[in-house]
Amino acid sequence: MSKRRVVVTGMGMLSPVGNTVESSWKALLAGQSGIVNIEHFDTTNFSTRFAGLVKGFDCEQYMSKKDARKMDLFIQYGIAAGIQALEDSGLEVNEENAARIGVAIGSGIGGLELIETGHQALIEKGPRKVSPFFVPSTIVNMIAGNLSIMRGLRGPNIAISTACTTGLHNIGHAARMIAYGDADAMVAGGAEKASTPLGMAGFGAAKALSTRNDEPQKASRPWDKDRDGFVLGDGAGIMVLEEYEHAKARGAKIYAEVVGFGMSGDAYHMTSPSEDGSGGALAMEAAMRDAGVTGEQIGYVNAHGTSTPAGDVAEVKGIKRALGEAGTKQVLVSSTKSMTGHLLGAAGSVEAIITVMSLVDQMVPPTINLDNPEEGLGVDLVPHVARKVESMEYAMCNSFGFGGTNGSLIFKRM
């Protein structure tokens, strides 16, 4: 079966550095951090008291207050970014095409905040005080469910949940649905809102988070010798993907083409990556095979780069393994998590959008806080300042998750 070409025609984003793609991209190129102290609950007894938070979000721009009350914030974030993406794409949904337009939006954790408050109501006041909207306001597939209802999208409706690879996997699989004829367009990505007491306590107990409470904006420092864990982030990133001829026929604006998607498993450890980077390398190699490109053709890798001692080094080893010596010498690698923190299930889709924007504007965002780089890495990590490039045709985005689930996407400049 010959595959159909898939392109990106719309993008939407809520992130710790901006509530649109445009504002987020501008902040990232300027090297601005979105990490702040947590003030929406008492963090006195928490080992980490900061996160990458969405700021100034007004749900009523996207839905009624009545509907918002039935949704955890992760759903609201996902719908907001989804509506932004649909409006950006100019894709009109009608009776004739609705069954050919689908949704693939997931979350790594889901409605943690309302799970916490729902459990509290159960314990303190009994089962009759649990909201009748508890289940549909917290389960992972309800971004896709609500958005499809709001916009009349009757094509494939799925929500892949694969920890920190969620957003990327949803985009990759949505692209394949289009490529193999299951849909003509898909709204795809991920959303997360895990900066809750239980979320912060859980990741803190696992010793996964940075504890640099005196300097929150310097806490996320991928590949720096002084890194001490990741910074939790909230937000959503959504793309509208479309079959190329379908997009061209309606005169759509085309940002980039999705040319490669690869997946793999570490088969190594619950939370730590394979030390030699081989798991991530398998996903990158699969994406390059799918795209029909070599390592030397990849101009930029938006790395998973979470600022953990083990993960950062393993990923660079994987990049070098996948791209080869010649590819490693010329590729630029950066981690925008140095500015946004780690958005868990939204990370891969937010960073896929950033990867596309790097092709559109021929600009590579920096890795901030890289003051004392780990020795012997042997790749250009774009420290501190964004980099202007020329004639960059291909860029890759990596996402790796707990359980050893890995994904890579390759986009081509149009």
From Swiss-Prot:
Keywords: Acyltransferase, Fatty acid biosynthesis, Fatty acid metabolism, Lipid biosynthesis, Lipid metabolism, Transferase. Coiled coil: none annotated. Residues 3-413 form the Ketosynthase family 3 (KS3) domain. It catalyses: a fatty acyl-[ACP] + malonyl-[ACP] + H(+) = a 3-oxoacyl-[ACP] + holo-[ACP] + CO2; (9Z)-hexadecenoyl-[ACP] + malonyl-[ACP] + H(+) = 3-oxo-(11Z)-octadecenoyl-[ACP] + holo-[ACP] + CO2. It comes from the Bacteria. SUPFAM superfamilies: Thiolase-like. Pathway: Lipid metabolism; fatty acid biosynthesis. One of its GO terms (molecular function) is 3-oxoacyl-[acyl-carrier-protein] synthase activity. GO terms for biological process: fatty acid biosynthetic process. The active site is at C164 (for beta-ketoacyl synthase activity), H304 (for beta-ketoacyl synthase activity), H342 (for beta-ketoacyl synthase activity). GO terms for cellular component: cytosol. It is an enzyme of class 2 (transferase). InterPro entries: 3-oxoacyl-ACP_synth-2, Beta-ketoacyl_synthase, Ketoacyl_synth_AS, Ketoacyl_synth_C, Ketoacyl_synth_N, PKS_Beta-ketoAc_synthase_dom, Thiolase-like. Its EC number is 2.3.1.179. Involved in the type II fatty acid elongation cycle. Catalyzes the elongation of a wide range of acyl-ACP by the addition of two carbons from malonyl-ACP to an acyl acceptor. Can efficiently catalyze the conversion of palmitoleoyl-ACP (cis-hexadec-9-enoyl-ACP) to cis-vaccenoyl-ACP (cis-octadec-11-enoyl-ACP), an essential step in the thermal regulation of fatty acid composition. Belongs to the thiolase-like superfamily. Beta-ketoacyl-ACP synthases family. Homodimer. This is 3-oxoacyl-[acyl-carrier-protein] synthase 2. The gene is fabF.
